[in-house]
Amino acid sequence: MYRKILLTLALTVGFAATALAQEVTIGLTMGTTGPGASLGIHYRNAFQLMPKTIGGYPVKFIMLEDKTDATEAAKNGRELITQDKVDAFMGSVAVPSTTQLAQIANELKTPLMALSPVALPPDKLDWTFVVPQSTTLMMSAVVDDMKKKGVKTVGYIGFSDSWGDLVLKAVEEKAEPAGIKIVTNERYARADTSVTGQVLKVIAADPDAVVVGGSGTGGALPHIGLVERGYRKQIYHNHGTVNREFIKVGGKSVEGAIAPTGPLIVPEELPVDNPVKKVALDFTTRYEQTFGPGSRNAFAGYSYDGFLLLDAAVPIAAKTAKPGTPEFRQALRDALENVKNVIGTHGVYNMTPKDHNGLDERARVLVRVDDGEWKLLK
Protein backbone atom coordinates (compact mmCIF):
# COMPACT_ATOMS: atom_id res chain seq x y z
CA MET A 1 0.00 0.00 0.00
CA TYR A 2 1.23 3.48 -0.85
CA ARG A 3 1.46 5.36 2.43
CA LYS A 4 1.48 9.06 2.97
CA ILE A 5 4.43 11.40 2.77
CA LEU A 6 4.29 14.17 5.33
CA LEU A 7 5.53 17.52 4.08
CA THR A 8 5.53 19.61 7.22
CA LEU A 9 6.75 22.88 5.83
CA ALA A 10 5.91 24.79 8.99
CA LEU A 11 8.41 23.36 11.45
CA THR A 12 8.11 24.02 15.16
CA VAL A 13 11.58 25.57 15.31
CA GLY A 14 10.65 28.08 12.65
CA PHE A 15 7.51 29.14 14.45
CA ALA A 16 8.48 29.50 18.09
CA ALA A 17 6.92 32.94 18.15
CA THR A 18 3.64 31.57 16.86
CA ALA A 19 3.49 28.38 18.86
CA LEU A 20 -0.10 29.03 19.77
CA ALA A 21 -1.18 29.59 16.18
CA GLN A 22 -3.49 27.06 14.61
CA GLU A 23 -1.92 24.96 11.89
CA VAL A 24 -3.66 24.70 8.52
CA THR A 25 -3.56 21.20 7.03
CA ILE A 26 -3.81 20.65 3.28
CA GLY A 27 -4.24 17.17 1.84
CA LEU A 28 -2.82 16.17 -1.55
CA THR A 29 -3.51 13.14 -3.73
CA MET A 30 -1.16 12.89 -6.71
CA GLY A 31 -0.48 10.33 -9.42
CA THR A 32 3.31 10.30 -9.67
CA THR A 33 3.16 6.75 -11.02
CA GLY A 34 0.87 5.18 -13.61
CA PRO A 35 -0.14 6.71 -16.96
CA GLY A 36 -0.26 10.26 -15.57
CA ALA A 37 3.18 10.18 -13.97
CA SER A 38 4.73 12.69 -16.38
CA LEU A 39 2.21 15.23 -15.09
CA GLY A 40 1.99 14.10 -11.47
CA ILE A 41 5.70 14.47 -10.84
CA HIS A 42 5.47 18.16 -11.71
CA TYR A 43 2.33 18.68 -9.61
CA ARG A 44 4.26 17.17 -6.70
CA ASN A 45 7.52 19.02 -7.32
CA ALA A 46 5.83 22.39 -6.88
CA PHE A 47 5.35 21.70 -3.18
CA GLN A 48 9.10 21.93 -2.65
CA LEU A 49 8.76 25.61 -3.56
CA MET A 50 5.76 26.49 -1.40
CA PRO A 51 5.98 29.11 1.36
CA LYS A 52 6.08 27.91 4.96
CA THR A 53 2.86 29.68 5.84
CA ILE A 54 -0.55 29.99 4.25
CA GLY A 55 -2.58 33.10 4.97
CA GLY A 56 -0.27 33.82 7.90
CA TYR A 57 -0.69 30.38 9.49
CA PRO A 58 1.78 27.49 9.69
CA VAL A 59 0.91 24.96 6.98
CA LYS A 60 1.24 21.19 6.83
CA PHE A 61 0.86 19.21 3.60
CA ILE A 62 -0.08 15.53 3.66
CA MET A 63 0.55 13.83 0.33
CA LEU A 64 -0.84 10.47 -0.80
CA GLU A 65 -0.02 8.57 -4.00
CA ASP A 66 -2.98 7.55 -6.18
CA LYS A 67 -1.12 5.94 -9.12
CA THR A 68 -3.31 7.88 -11.60
CA ASP A 69 -6.18 5.63 -10.60
CA ALA A 70 -9.62 7.14 -9.94
CA THR A 71 -10.54 4.54 -7.32
CA GLU A 72 -7.29 5.09 -5.46
CA ALA A 73 -7.73 8.86 -5.64
CA ALA A 74 -11.22 8.57 -4.17
CA LYS A 75 -9.91 6.40 -1.33
CA ASN A 76 -7.16 8.92 -0.63
CA GLY A 77 -9.64 11.80 -0.61
CA ARG A 78 -11.79 10.09 2.00
CA GLU A 79 -8.78 9.22 4.12
CA LEU A 80 -7.44 12.76 4.07
CA ILE A 81 -10.78 14.17 5.21
CA THR A 82 -11.98 11.54 7.67
CA GLN A 83 -8.67 10.49 9.22
CA ASP A 84 -6.32 13.42 8.75
CA LYS A 85 -9.01 16.08 9.19
CA VAL A 86 -7.57 18.31 6.47
CA ASP A 87 -8.91 21.82 6.04
CA ALA A 88 -8.80 21.51 2.24
CA PHE A 89 -7.40 19.08 -0.28
CA MET A 90 -5.89 19.20 -3.76
CA GLY A 91 -5.72 16.73 -6.67
CA SER A 92 -5.34 15.02 -9.00
CA VAL A 93 -3.49 14.52 -12.28
CA ALA A 94 -6.37 13.23 -14.42
CA VAL A 95 -9.99 14.28 -14.98
CA PRO A 96 -11.50 10.88 -13.99
CA SER A 97 -9.68 11.01 -10.64
CA THR A 98 -10.56 14.64 -10.02
CA THR A 99 -14.21 14.01 -10.83
CA GLN A 100 -14.29 11.44 -8.05
CA LEU A 101 -12.67 13.91 -5.67
CA ALA A 102 -15.28 16.56 -6.49
CA GLN A 103 -18.03 14.16 -5.44
CA ILE A 104 -16.24 13.48 -2.16
CA ALA A 105 -15.72 17.21 -1.55
CA ASN A 106 -19.47 17.76 -1.84
CA GLU A 107 -20.31 14.76 0.32
CA LEU A 108 -17.84 15.52 3.13
CA LYS A 109 -18.03 19.31 2.83
CA THR A 110 -14.33 20.00 2.41
CA PRO A 111 -12.93 22.46 -0.16
CA LEU A 112 -11.18 20.84 -3.12
CA MET A 113 -8.67 22.65 -5.30
CA ALA A 114 -9.11 20.65 -8.51
CA LEU A 115 -5.83 20.33 -10.40
CA SER A 116 -7.47 18.93 -13.54
CA PRO A 117 -10.10 20.86 -15.53
CA VAL A 118 -13.23 18.97 -14.54
CA ALA A 119 -16.42 20.17 -16.21
CA LEU A 120 -19.40 19.42 -13.97
CA PRO A 121 -22.74 21.16 -13.33
CA PRO A 122 -22.50 23.95 -10.73
CA ASP A 123 -24.27 21.89 -8.04
CA LYS A 124 -21.58 19.21 -8.44
CA LEU A 125 -18.86 21.82 -7.93
CA ASP A 126 -20.28 23.40 -4.79
CA TRP A 127 -17.13 22.56 -2.78
CA THR A 128 -14.73 22.38 -5.73
CA PHE A 129 -12.61 25.17 -7.20
CA VAL A 130 -11.04 24.38 -10.54
CA VAL A 131 -7.50 25.74 -10.88
CA PRO A 132 -6.70 24.95 -14.55
CA GLN A 133 -8.24 26.81 -17.44
CA SER A 134 -11.47 25.32 -18.77
CA THR A 135 -11.13 23.13 -21.82
CA THR A 136 -13.53 25.41 -23.69
CA LEU A 137 -11.41 28.49 -22.98
CA MET A 138 -8.27 26.76 -24.20
CA MET A 139 -9.60 24.94 -27.24
CA SER A 140 -11.38 28.06 -28.47
CA ALA A 141 -7.89 29.49 -29.06
CA VAL A 142 -7.08 26.42 -31.16
CA VAL A 143 -10.25 26.80 -33.21
CA ASP A 144 -9.52 30.50 -33.71
CA ASP A 145 -6.10 29.58 -35.11
CA MET A 146 -7.61 26.94 -37.40
CA LYS A 147 -10.15 29.43 -38.72
CA LYS A 148 -7.42 31.99 -39.36
CA LYS A 149 -5.50 29.38 -41.37
CA GLY A 150 -8.50 28.40 -43.47
CA VAL A 151 -9.09 24.95 -41.95
CA LYS A 152 -12.44 23.49 -43.04
CA THR A 153 -12.17 19.89 -41.80
CA VAL A 154 -10.49 18.52 -38.68
CA GLY A 155 -9.78 15.00 -37.50
CA TYR A 156 -10.01 14.12 -33.82
CA ILE A 157 -8.12 11.41 -31.93
CA GLY A 158 -8.19 11.38 -28.13
CA PHE A 159 -8.24 9.39 -24.92
CA SER A 160 -11.18 7.02 -24.46
CA ASP A 161 -12.12 8.62 -21.14
CA SER A 162 -13.62 11.81 -19.76
CA TRP A 163 -10.60 13.88 -20.77
CA GLY A 164 -10.95 12.78 -24.37
CA ASP A 165 -14.65 13.62 -24.14
CA LEU A 166 -13.97 17.08 -22.70
CA VAL A 167 -11.52 18.06 -25.41
CA LEU A 168 -13.82 16.82 -28.17
CA LYS A 169 -16.82 18.62 -26.69
CA ALA A 170 -14.88 21.88 -26.50
CA VAL A 171 -13.75 21.58 -30.11
CA GLU A 172 -17.28 20.70 -31.27
CA GLU A 173 -18.73 23.69 -29.44
CA LYS A 174 -16.43 26.15 -31.19
CA ALA A 175 -15.79 24.44 -34.54
CA GLU A 176 -19.33 24.34 -35.90
CA PRO A 177 -19.96 28.11 -35.59
CA ALA A 178 -16.56 28.64 -37.24
CA GLY A 179 -17.57 26.53 -40.24
CA ILE A 180 -15.18 23.69 -39.38
CA LYS A 181 -16.40 20.10 -39.70
CA ILE A 182 -15.08 17.30 -37.47
CA VAL A 183 -14.59 14.28 -39.73
CA THR A 184 -13.17 11.64 -37.32
CA ASN A 185 -13.58 10.71 -33.67
CA GLU A 186 -10.95 8.09 -32.89
CA ARG A 187 -10.11 7.00 -29.34
CA TYR A 188 -7.33 5.17 -27.49
CA ALA A 189 -6.61 4.20 -23.88
CA ARG A 190 -4.07 6.07 -21.77
CA ALA A 191 -1.95 2.94 -21.43
CA ASP A 192 -2.01 2.00 -25.14
CA THR A 193 1.34 1.63 -26.89
CA SER A 194 0.00 1.64 -30.45
CA VAL A 195 -2.68 3.66 -32.24
CA THR A 196 -2.00 2.45 -35.76
CA GLY A 197 -5.61 1.60 -36.57
CA GLN A 198 -6.93 4.94 -35.35
CA VAL A 199 -4.20 6.90 -37.15
CA LEU A 200 -4.92 5.15 -40.46
CA LYS A 201 -8.59 6.10 -40.19
CA VAL A 202 -7.69 9.74 -39.56
CA ILE A 203 -5.31 9.79 -42.54
CA ALA A 204 -7.97 8.18 -44.75
CA ALA A 205 -10.31 11.08 -43.95
CA ASP A 206 -7.61 13.53 -45.09
CA PRO A 207 -8.59 16.40 -42.76
CA ASP A 208 -7.07 19.87 -43.07
CA ALA A 209 -5.83 19.56 -39.47
CA VAL A 210 -5.89 17.12 -36.54
CA VAL A 211 -6.64 17.72 -32.86
CA VAL A 212 -5.19 15.29 -30.32
CA GLY A 213 -7.17 14.89 -27.10
CA GLY A 214 -4.51 13.18 -25.04
CA SER A 215 -2.27 14.44 -22.25
CA GLY A 216 1.33 14.12 -21.11
CA THR A 217 3.50 11.66 -22.97
CA GLY A 218 0.34 9.82 -24.05
CA GLY A 219 -0.48 12.80 -26.25
CA ALA A 220 2.65 12.20 -28.34
CA LEU A 221 1.62 8.71 -29.49
CA PRO A 222 -0.92 9.67 -32.20
CA HIS A 223 1.20 12.61 -33.30
CA ILE A 224 4.18 10.33 -33.94
CA GLY A 225 1.95 7.86 -35.77
CA LEU A 226 0.47 10.53 -38.02
CA VAL A 227 3.87 11.93 -39.00
CA GLU A 228 5.37 8.47 -39.58
CA ARG A 229 2.54 7.72 -42.01
CA GLY A 230 3.03 10.86 -44.02
CA TYR A 231 0.57 13.34 -42.53
CA ARG A 232 2.09 16.78 -43.12
CA LYS A 233 -0.71 19.16 -42.14
CA GLN A 234 -1.10 20.97 -38.81
CA ILE A 235 -1.51 18.88 -35.65
CA TYR A 236 -2.96 20.62 -32.59
CA HIS A 237 -2.91 19.50 -28.96
CA ASN A 238 -4.47 20.72 -25.72
CA HIS A 239 -3.08 22.16 -22.51
CA GLY A 240 -2.55 18.67 -21.10
CA THR A 241 0.48 18.04 -23.30
CA VAL A 242 2.65 21.08 -22.69
CA ASN A 243 5.67 19.73 -20.88
CA ARG A 244 9.23 18.67 -21.66
CA GLU A 245 8.39 14.96 -21.53
CA PHE A 246 6.02 15.31 -24.49
CA ILE A 247 8.88 16.68 -26.61
CA LYS A 248 11.34 14.06 -25.33
CA VAL A 249 9.02 11.24 -26.35
CA GLY A 250 7.95 12.82 -29.63
CA GLY A 251 11.35 14.06 -30.75
CA LYS A 252 11.49 15.55 -34.24
CA SER A 253 8.04 14.14 -35.01
CA VAL A 254 6.34 16.73 -32.80
CA GLU A 255 8.15 19.74 -34.27
CA GLY A 256 5.51 22.29 -35.19
CA ALA A 257 2.88 20.98 -32.77
CA ILE A 258 0.61 23.78 -31.55
CA ALA A 259 -1.14 23.80 -28.18
CA PRO A 260 -2.84 26.24 -25.80
CA THR A 261 -1.29 26.72 -22.38
CA GLY A 262 -0.93 29.19 -19.55
CA PRO A 263 1.41 32.20 -19.72
CA LEU A 264 3.94 30.65 -17.32
CA ILE A 265 5.39 28.53 -20.12
CA VAL A 266 6.69 31.63 -21.92
CA PRO A 267 6.90 34.44 -19.33
CA GLU A 268 9.98 35.98 -20.93
CA GLU A 269 8.02 36.51 -24.15
CA LEU A 270 5.03 38.21 -22.50
CA PRO A 271 4.52 41.98 -22.76
CA VAL A 272 5.77 43.99 -19.79
CA ASP A 273 2.22 45.05 -18.91
CA ASN A 274 0.90 41.47 -18.77
CA PRO A 275 -0.42 41.07 -15.19
CA VAL A 276 0.79 37.47 -14.95
CA LYS A 277 4.35 38.06 -16.18
CA LYS A 278 6.01 38.80 -12.82
CA VAL A 279 4.47 35.88 -10.91
CA ALA A 280 5.00 33.43 -13.77
CA LEU A 281 8.61 34.49 -14.32
CA ASP A 282 9.43 34.24 -10.62
CA PHE A 283 7.93 30.75 -10.37
CA THR A 284 9.55 29.37 -13.54
CA THR A 285 12.91 30.79 -12.46
CA ARG A 286 12.73 29.12 -9.06
CA TYR A 287 11.40 25.88 -10.55
CA GLU A 288 14.22 25.62 -13.07
CA GLN A 289 16.81 26.51 -10.46
CA THR A 290 15.55 23.53 -8.44
CA PHE A 291 14.74 20.99 -11.15
CA GLY A 292 16.98 22.03 -14.03
CA PRO A 293 16.90 24.21 -17.15
CA GLY A 294 13.90 23.56 -19.38
CA SER A 295 11.91 21.82 -16.64
CA ARG A 296 9.16 24.47 -16.60
CA ASN A 297 5.67 23.10 -17.17
CA ALA A 298 2.04 24.04 -16.72
CA PHE A 299 1.26 21.43 -14.08
CA ALA A 300 3.54 22.66 -11.31
CA GLY A 301 1.95 26.05 -11.90
CA TYR A 302 -1.50 24.64 -11.21
CA SER A 303 -0.32 23.38 -7.82
CA TYR A 304 1.16 26.77 -7.04
CA ASP A 305 -1.95 28.66 -8.15
CA GLY A 306 -4.09 26.37 -6.00
CA PHE A 307 -1.90 27.33 -3.06
CA LEU A 308 -2.19 31.04 -3.89
CA LEU A 309 -5.99 30.81 -3.94
CA LEU A 310 -6.00 29.13 -0.54
CA ASP A 311 -3.48 31.67 0.72
CA ALA A 312 -5.92 34.45 -0.18
CA ALA A 313 -8.91 32.70 1.41
CA VAL A 314 -7.42 31.39 4.67
CA PRO A 315 -7.14 34.74 6.52
CA ILE A 316 -10.74 35.56 5.60
CA ALA A 317 -11.98 32.21 6.87
CA ALA A 318 -9.88 32.52 10.03
CA LYS A 319 -11.82 35.62 11.06
CA THR A 320 -14.84 33.46 11.88
CA ALA A 321 -13.48 29.98 12.67
CA LYS A 322 -10.37 28.04 13.70
CA PRO A 323 -8.49 25.69 11.37
CA GLY A 324 -9.25 22.05 11.97
CA THR A 325 -12.99 22.54 12.41
CA PRO A 326 -16.03 22.03 10.16
CA GLU A 327 -16.81 25.71 10.64
CA PHE A 328 -13.43 26.65 9.20
CA ARG A 329 -13.92 24.41 6.18
CA GLN A 330 -17.27 26.08 5.51
CA ALA A 331 -15.77 29.54 5.96
CA LEU A 332 -12.86 28.62 3.70
CA ARG A 333 -15.24 27.43 0.99
CA ASP A 334 -17.23 30.66 1.23
CA ALA A 335 -14.06 32.76 1.09
CA LEU A 336 -12.72 30.89 -1.94
CA GLU A 337 -15.99 31.53 -3.75
CA ASN A 338 -15.42 35.26 -3.51
CA VAL A 339 -11.66 35.78 -3.96
CA LYS A 340 -10.83 38.53 -6.42
CA ASN A 341 -7.77 39.49 -8.46
CA VAL A 342 -5.57 36.63 -7.27
CA ILE A 343 -2.65 36.74 -9.70
CA GLY A 344 -1.27 33.28 -10.35
CA THR A 345 1.20 31.75 -12.76
CA HIS A 346 -1.57 30.97 -15.24
CA GLY A 347 -3.89 33.94 -14.98
CA VAL A 348 -5.90 36.28 -12.79
CA TYR A 349 -8.54 34.48 -10.71
CA ASN A 350 -11.89 36.10 -9.93
CA MET A 351 -14.24 33.57 -8.36
CA THR A 352 -18.01 33.99 -8.03
CA PRO A 353 -20.79 31.73 -6.72
CA LYS A 354 -21.54 30.82 -10.35
CA ASP A 355 -17.93 30.55 -11.51
CA HIS A 356 -15.57 28.34 -9.50
CA ASN A 357 -12.75 28.78 -12.00
CA GLY A 358 -12.57 32.53 -12.42
CA LEU A 359 -10.16 32.72 -15.36
CA ASP A 360 -10.51 34.68 -18.60
CA GLU A 361 -8.58 34.98 -21.87
CA ARG A 362 -5.56 36.39 -20.03
CA ALA A 363 -4.97 32.81 -18.88
CA ARG A 364 -4.11 31.39 -22.29
CA VAL A 365 -1.52 31.63 -25.02
CA LEU A 366 -0.75 29.43 -28.00
CA VAL A 367 2.67 27.79 -28.12
CA ARG A 368 4.47 25.77 -30.78
CA VAL A 369 7.30 23.24 -30.61
CA ASP A 370 10.23 24.99 -32.28
CA ASP A 371 13.70 23.39 -32.22
CA GLY A 372 12.70 21.16 -29.34
CA GLU A 373 11.24 23.92 -27.15
CA TRP A 374 7.76 25.27 -26.48
CA LYS A 375 7.75 28.85 -27.78
CA LEU A 376 5.07 31.52 -28.02
CA LEU A 377 3.17 31.37 -31.30
CA LYS A 378 3.29 34.83 -32.82
Regions found by a protein language model. Give the residues of each.
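Extracytosolic ligand-binding ectodomains
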Residues: 2-11, 21-378
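N-terminal signal peptide c-region/cleavage motif recognized by signal peptidases
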Residues: 14-18
